[in-house]
């Protein structure tokens, strides 16, 4: 099992997007009350099956929907590993308030990604969206996150609305390939709720 690691130009990261990601990087695990547990985040405003809506406590204009992987697998040298030291993968869609109806997708891997590598999100074994790890990471949030390109954002949201399951394949700094499975039940409802709750003043 191999992942394409060809070098590509780095995506341009939205400042607001990075701030929100930084707010949630300390933990990707959902608690039983659907809260990320950070001081600057509220509990989930509302949950729709596999997806939950979050709003920043300090800035209500910062908000996103998120879902944690229901299954994680790891491979090295084409052999499946029985266990790896990592947190669960999390997929985010973040509302960009400075741009009407625009969103940004990001993936929290739960481990340091290979620098500049690609992570491939495949929806229903048909559609694919490429996420990119940071080409020169320094902060922790730059090491364990991957971002979709701006030109793929609308396509990503459309695919997730129509799909039932998505699998993210990524590669770690130790050349371990991971596959995280996300269910898409409730995605459209969560996105609609996000639009209602997260509006610029």
Predicted feature residues:
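Low-complexity, intrinsically disordered segments with a bias for serine/threonine
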Residues: 13, 31-32
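Serine residues within intrinsically disordered or low-complexity segments
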Residues: 9, 27-28, 35
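N-terminal secretory signal peptides that target proteins for export/translocation
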Residues: 1-14
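Bacterial N-terminal signal peptides
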Residues: 18-31
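A generic "folded-domain core" signal
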Residues: 36-201
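Hydrophobic alpha-helical segments and their boundary regions
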Residues: 16-17, 114
């Amino acid at each position: 099992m191999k992942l394409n690691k060809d070098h590509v130009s780095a995506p341009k990261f939205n400042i607001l997007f990075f701030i929100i990601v930084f707010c949630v990087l300390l933990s990707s695990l959902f608690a039983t009350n659907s809260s990320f547990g950070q001081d600057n985040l509220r509990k989930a405003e509302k949950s729709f099956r596999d997806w939950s809506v979050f709003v920043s406590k300090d800035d209500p204009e910062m908000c996103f929907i998120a879902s944690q992987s229901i299954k994680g697998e790891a491979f090295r040298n084409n052999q499946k590993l029985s266990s790896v030291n990592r947190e669960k993968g999390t997929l985010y869609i973040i509302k960009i308030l400075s741009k009407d109806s625009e969103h940004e997708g990001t993936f929290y891997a739960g481990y340091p990604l290979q620098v500049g590598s690609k992570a491939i999100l495949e929806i229903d074994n048909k559609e694919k969206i490429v996420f990119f790890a940071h080409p020169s990471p320094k902060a922790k949030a730059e090491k364990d996150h991957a971002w979709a390109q701006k030109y793929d954002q609308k396509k990503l949201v459309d695919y997730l609305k129509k799909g039932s399951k998505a699998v993210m394949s990524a590669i770690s700094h130790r050349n371990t390939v991971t596959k995280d499975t996300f269910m898409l039940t409730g995605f459209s409802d969560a996105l609609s709720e996000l639009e209602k709750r997260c509006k610029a003043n």
